Amino acid sequence: MMNEVLLKFKQLDLSPYIQPLPEKPAEKLKVYGIDGAYVADIEAPLHFLEPIRPDLIRRAYLSALSARFQPKGVYEGAGKEHSCESFGVGLGIARIPRYKGSLWPRGCFAPNTRGGRRAHPPKVEKKLHEEINKKEKKLAIRSAIAATAYRSWVAARGHVVEKVPSLPVVVVGDAEKINRAKEAKKLFEALGLWPDVERAAEGVKIRAGKGKMRGRRYKEPKSVLVVVSDLNAPLIAAVRNFPGVDVVAVNNLNILVLAPGGVPGRLTLWTAPAVEKLRGLFL
């Protein structure tokens, strides 16, 4: 039986799920200085040569998103803490349980009564997390990393890339020492990333619904993802308040920041030390 299953699996045609690469992947990555000038070439990690799998990226995103869901339940005695009983049959009234009292007390306990129990309350044991295999998860992350290197995928996601010299955008390690927002803005302008930050700033809108009262007043589009080599890099404090910008250490890369909404192709700024660290990760 197992051999038949394996045989059928090997005969599966995965071509509909593997997107053809829109252009030839670059084997060398261009490194730019803080002033935006070309500095050198470095060998591209294998992650950037991975086939792009939107189906796996979407699946990994839903798995990571559902892992945040909080189990919900209700108090077992909710709606049942009343002294009530049914009057029985033969009185020309519904057999619904009623409060004890004079005349015809109102109904209680039943789901269709005021203050009664819920018919189908949320269960704590309900499975909320969509599981994913470890190898699938790593493959999805590598595929999402590869999508950041293609201008067509990044532009299709809505990012402004007209002034970006090349993708992926890699900057020298000295950029991680920047600790002022003014200097970080100059870096973004030199690399052609600032127009995308302005796009995110213009897209900030007030949320519809009750979320406004619950600490989620504004909806903000995603713009540039900055990947650094270390969480202690001063650059993190310099750029974290830019509209739509996320900063993450390379060893903490995840599908939620690489493909927000499950859509690959986020505009990403890599530092050269982060690219070197990436070579041994998610393989």
Curated annotation (Swiss-Prot):
PROSITE patterns: RIBOSOMAL_L1E (PS00939). GO terms for cellular component: cytosolic large ribosomal subunit. GO terms for biological process: translation. Keywords: Ribonucleoprotein, Ribosomal protein, RNA-binding, rRNA-binding. Coiled coil: none annotated. GO terms for molecular function: RNA binding; rRNA binding; structural constituent of ribosome. The keyword Ribosomal protein applies. Belongs to the universal ribosomal protein uL4 family. PANTHER family: 60S RIBOSOMAL PROTEIN L4. HAMAP family: Ribosomal_uL4_A. One of the primary rRNA binding proteins, this protein initially binds near the 5'-end of the 23S rRNA. It is important during the early stages of 50S assembly. It makes multiple contacts with different domains of the 23S rRNA in the assembled 50S subunit and ribosome. This is Large ribosomal subunit protein uL4. It comes from Pyrobaculum aerophilum (strain ATCC 51768 / DSM 7523 / JCM 9630 / CIP 104966 / NBRC 100827 / IM2).
